[in-house]
From Swiss-Prot:
It catalyses: fluoride(in) = fluoride(out). Na(+) binds at G74, T77. Keywords: Cell inner membrane, Cell membrane, Ion channel, Ion transport, Membrane, Metal-binding, Sodium, Transmembrane, Transmembrane helix, Transport. Its main location: membrane. The chain crosses the membrane at residues 5-25, 34-54, 67-87, 99-119. It comes from Haemophilus influenzae (strain 86-028NP). The gene is fluC. It comes from the Bacteria. One of its GO terms (cellular component) is plasma membrane. This is Fluoride-specific ion channel FluC. One of its GO terms (molecular function) is fluoride channel activity.
Length: 128
């Protein structure tokens, strides 16, 4: 039961941030939901930093991992929204736009995760 509370508290914060990002960035472009991309890229950057941290400090309580990764980042990033936005572009015969959004999410998120790991490694070396 305690694990569920940690996940839930993280999810409240992650979903709230995702909603705010959507409100802020989605109106910028009419062709696709820019907020979803920002949320996914930011989430992948943060998960990269957290992966580096948890790899270096495996003794950190599993509750933090549940709170930050499963709860917060699980609700901040949104594969289902991304998927529906790409499919909607395809169904509206906007194949190039859909493919571009697909590639931005895929390669951007992978790159941000790697960047997050590198940022953590550099920061941990500078601080030690």
């Amino acid at each position: 039961m305690q694990a569920l509370l940690f996940i839930s508290y993280g999810a409240i914060l992650g979903a709230s941030l995702r909603w705010a990002i959507g409100l802020l960035f989605n109106p910028l472009f009419s062709s696709f939901a820019f907020g979803t991309l920002i949320a996914n890229l930011l989430g992948c950057l943060i998960i990269g930093v957290l992966l580096g941290f948890f790899w270096q400090f495996p003794q950190i309580s599993s509750e933090w991992r549940l709170f930050l990764i499963t709860g917060f980042l699980g609700s901040l990033t949104t594969f289902s929204s991304f998927s529906s936005e790409v499919v909607e572009l395809f169904f509206n015969d906007k194949w190039l736009n859909g493919f571009c959004v697909l590639m931005m999410h895929l390669f951007g998120c992978l790159a941000m995760t790697v960047l997050g790991i590198w940022i953590y490694k550099i920061c941990s070396q500078l601080l030690s």
